Amino acid sequence: MLQFLTFGPMNQISGDPIRLRHVLLGCTCVLALTGILPSNLIAQSTSSPNSTPEWHQAVAAFQALASAHENLTTFQVFGTSDVGRPLHLFTIGSPTSDLRILINNAIHPGEPCGVNASIAWATELLENPEQIPDNTCIAIVPMYNVGGGLRRNCCTRANQLGPEEYGFRGNARNLDLNRDFIKCDSRNALAFNEMFVRFDPDIFVDTHTSNGADYQPALTLITTQPDKLGGPLAAWLENDFAPQLYARMAKRGERMIPYVNSIESTPDGGIVDFLETPRYSTGYGALHHAIGFTTEAHMLKPFSQRVSATLEFLRVLLETAAEEGGYIRNLRQQQRAAFLSSDLAPVAWEADTTAIDSLSFPGFTARYEWSNVTGSRRLRYDREAPYEKAIPYLHTFQPTRFAPIPEAFVVPQAWRHVVERLDANGVEYARVPEDTTMVLEVTTILAHSASPRPYEGHHYRTVEKVQRSMEPVRLYKGDLIIPMNQSAARYLVETLSPEGVDAFMAWNFFDSALQQKEYFSAYVFEETAEAMLREDADLNAKFEEEKAQKGAAWSSRAQLDWLYKRSPHYEGTASRYPVFSIPKGQPVPFQRP
């Protein structure tokens, strides 16, 4: 059945026939309803091996498939993009199936091979329904970055061979949507969060085209970093599932290697796994215990070859995953339980440079010659000199920061932008029924730093040192009590713990809490400071010790400030992180209904 289902605020559209009609026409629904067969429509949208559909053509192709196969498919609007156009989800099979696979295309519309591959794959499956495994649902986002997709051009991908035209990396607000899955500055990301949690995929694929070195294979793969993923899923992924994907791709003549993230200027010096933290698509998926794969088709291979390699991966993925049946979903349930059984969770990682593996790498010989442009040495890969040799491979990561897993988080309702993102991720919570005071674990930010230049609309902040203590906290009717015994537990820890590499704190959601609001005038405070030292011998001794240590470098203003922060006048909430915790093992009041 051809359906236009909506999530969240888009329900307002589905309930309004006039607005719904406008949405459908904007999606060129008329094409799907006027007898144009999917094959003809697809041929129009990919008129040559070096072309890729425009946004409306991709949407129309999936709409036509849904119209032609109503008993097997749905076509849904799940939100609105920043450019005002709808976001779509095409599904084959029942969303309640034991195995659910989600494919996201054109997060970077200049890298569109997944769009072509997904249309071809869906067509292939629907024309041969016996190839669709039982109890399996496949969901496809035709083009996620709609704004970037509308910005068609020939040339912004300077390193890339084809297609003739493609979209642009940034969205309508010039955001890189593959850095936006936690901060959700875009409407796209907020809608995607909600759709992702509702669909609850077991496997998530994000299709891309690479940058970087030249080498022989047409496809490389970023797999959810196993050490970061952790738990029973990680062992199965690394030792069983991922090796099967590589082996089956090779058997079909489409050799695939890990993503080429070079340690040095060329792969000869080795490669290191790409660490997809939660800002990235598959890193976000890992917060919900989904296995993620990012396909990276090689930029210098012909576009048709990149599409073919991506298509083959989708086929192999479905075939391999279907053999596991409901095993993956059972592993994910075990993963959630394993996470909650721990007292601490890693929230930042780095490559372990002491654990070096070896990878047989099919590359091209790198040569250096003099540039006719700059007069300096330049790099050239010699395709007439291919090689296969072992190179160092850094595949092991270790945590660098941990955060406690509490019994519950407490989030004041004042931080509404955080609450909005929690809602999008299906977080369950209770509201404080009346104003009250609770003794909670309070985190004070003792050291932090921010990037001097903006990055994706923010000055990224790193929290370097915190202190936790139990203190009375004033709460107000409507504040959130968030128990951890829920499926979103890992998402909560990694976004609400200030140490998290992609926590809300890192993306400036709580910056105003760091600022001191009241100060003193020295000429007024001098008498108070003198009285403090006279009446408190211990304070006076500590003050003299500080003076001796800092000497002449300790200015008179700094000395008074030291005393001010130990006086009753100091507000005490500056640098107090405004999310609180109920430590593990303690009772949680106001349980959710």
Where are these predicted regions, by residue range?
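Bacterial N-terminal signal peptides
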Residues: 26-40
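Structured catalytic-domain cores with a bias toward divalent-metal coordination
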Residues: 2-8, 12-22, 41-593
